[in-house]
């Protein structure tokens, strides 16, 4: 804050009729500030010679000294402010040509690095996608391999079960064939026994015929043999039919059991295959969900790291801005304090000026209306307007 001081000239008044001559120390000053006025200040008693009594002169001298000291302080502060402004301008002019090119080069380097980072991120993302696709393809092929391997094991187990059934059927067939052979052998044995019995009967009947030829009528042996043969053949046919019927029923039951067991086996195998396919599909889906979860976790980790770095940068920027704001607040407070000090100085100076003005007005009121008739050292007097006023109020 600059102050201007307009000191009045020490010459005589131009109009002696309107205002008498006043001493130079009694003229008012347009200055800001305040000062503690001594308690012995009283109304000035003016004389024609323009002199004061002792206490009034001391008060005016004290006020003039204080005013001069304040003016000197103001001029010193103005000189210091001018020097500081000049120093700041020189420092800013010296730093501007050095900082601008370096900042531009740094900005270009930062942009290039950011472009490289973006390209690297895009390439990294592409590679991650390719790796994920390769992992999914490998998992798909692995699941297909496992499915085919499980189907192969299932088919092998089916083949082994069918082989066991075939072995059982072969054993059953061999058993039935052995039974048929035993029945055939039994039939052959029965035929042999029948033939032996027929032969024995023929031999016995032949002897009897030879003995009783003359005593009894002849018996038709061929008819008897035919009847016996027909009876045995009927018995053999009945036994054969029963055995064939039993064999057919047993074979039919076995076939029914084989068909029902094969149908059940096929239904169970189809159900097992369907369940295995469902399990494989669920395993593939589970693996895909695991891969998706892993990729999402990786993306979340990268996003957290990226945003944490950005957050740290923003926090550092906020810290810098807060420190700058704190410095600015300190500067503002300091300037406000200086401003308050200067306002206090101005108020004190204005108080002193008002004191000056009140003293001058009170002394002006006490002076007579006629011009003073004092004579200076050279003999000149202070007359009315138009007269010589060279020695007035020196």
From Swiss-Prot:
Residues 364-394 are annotated as: Tail. Belongs to the intermediate filament family. One of its GO terms (cellular component) is extracellular space. Residues 103-203 are annotated as: Coil 1B. The record marks 305 as: Stutter. Coiled coil: none annotated. There are two types of hair/microfibrillar keratin, I (acidic) and II (neutral to basic). Residues 1-56 are annotated as: Head. InterPro entries: IF_conserved (IPR018039), IF_rod_dom (IPR039008), Keratin_I (IPR002957). This is Keratin, type I cuticular Ha4. Residues 92-102 are annotated as: Linker 1. It comes from the Eukaryota. Residues 220-363 are annotated as: Coil 2. GO terms for molecular function: structural molecule activity. It holds the Pfam family Filament. Expressed in the hair follicles. Transmembrane segments: none annotated. Residues 57-91 are annotated as: Coil 1A. Residues 204-219 are annotated as: Linker 12. Residues 56-367 form the IF rod domain. The keyword Coiled coil applies. PANTHER family: IF ROD DOMAIN-CONTAINING PROTEIN-RELATED, INTERMEDIATE FILAMENT. It comes from Homo sapiens (Human). GO terms for biological process: epidermis development; epithelial cell differentiation; intermediate filament organization. Keywords: Coiled coil, Intermediate filament, Keratin.
């Amino acid at each position: 804050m600059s102050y201007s001081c307009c000191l009045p000239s020490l010459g005589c008044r131009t109009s002696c009729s309107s205002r008498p001559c006043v001493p130079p120390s009694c003229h008012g000053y347009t200055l800001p500030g305040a000062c503690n006025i001594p308690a012995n200040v009283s109304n000035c008693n003016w004389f024609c010679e323009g002199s004061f009594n002792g206490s009034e002169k001391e008060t005016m001298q004290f006020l003039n000294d204080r005013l001069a000291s304040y003016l000197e302080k103001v001029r010193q502060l103005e000189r210091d402010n001018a020097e500081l402004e000049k120093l700041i301008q020189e420092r800013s002019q010296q730093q501007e040509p050095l900082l601008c090119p370096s900042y531009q080069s740094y900005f270009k380097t930062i942009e290039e690095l950011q472009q490289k980072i973006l390209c690297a991120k895009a390439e990294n993302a592409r590679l991650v996608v390719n790796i994920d696709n390769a992992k999914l393809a490998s998992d798909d092929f692995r699941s297909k391999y496992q499915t085919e391997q499980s189907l192969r094991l299932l088919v092998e187990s089916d083949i082994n079960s069918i082989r066991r059934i075939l072995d059982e059927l072969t054993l059953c067939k061999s058993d039935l064939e052995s039974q048929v052979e035993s029945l055939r052998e039994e039939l052959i044995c029965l035929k042999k026994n029948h033939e032996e019995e027929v032969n024995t009967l023929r031999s016995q009947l032949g002897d009897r015929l030879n003995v009783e030829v003359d005593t009894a009528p002849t018996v038709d042996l061929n008819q008897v043999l035919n009847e016996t043969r027909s009876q045995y053949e009927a018995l053999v046919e009945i036994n054969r039919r029963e055995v064939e019927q039993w064999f057919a029923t047993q074979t039919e039951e076995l076939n029914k059991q084989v068909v029902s067991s094969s149908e059940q086996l096929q239904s169970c195998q189809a159900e097992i295959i369907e369940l295995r396919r469902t399990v494989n599909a669920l395993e593939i889906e589970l693996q895909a969900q695991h891969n998706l979860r892993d990729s999402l976790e990786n993306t979340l980790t990268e996003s957290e790291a990226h945003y944490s770095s950005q957050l740290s940068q923003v926090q550092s920027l906020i810290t810098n801005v807060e420190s700058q704001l704190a410095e600015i607040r300190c500067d503002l407070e300091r300037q406000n304090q200086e401003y308050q000090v200067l306002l206090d100085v101005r108020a004190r100076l204005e108080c002193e000026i008002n004191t000056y003005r009140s003293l001058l007005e009170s002394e002006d009121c006490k002076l007579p209306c006629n011009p003073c008739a004092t004579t200076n050292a050279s003999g000149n007097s202070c007359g009315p307007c138009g007269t010589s006023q060279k020695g007035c109020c020196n």
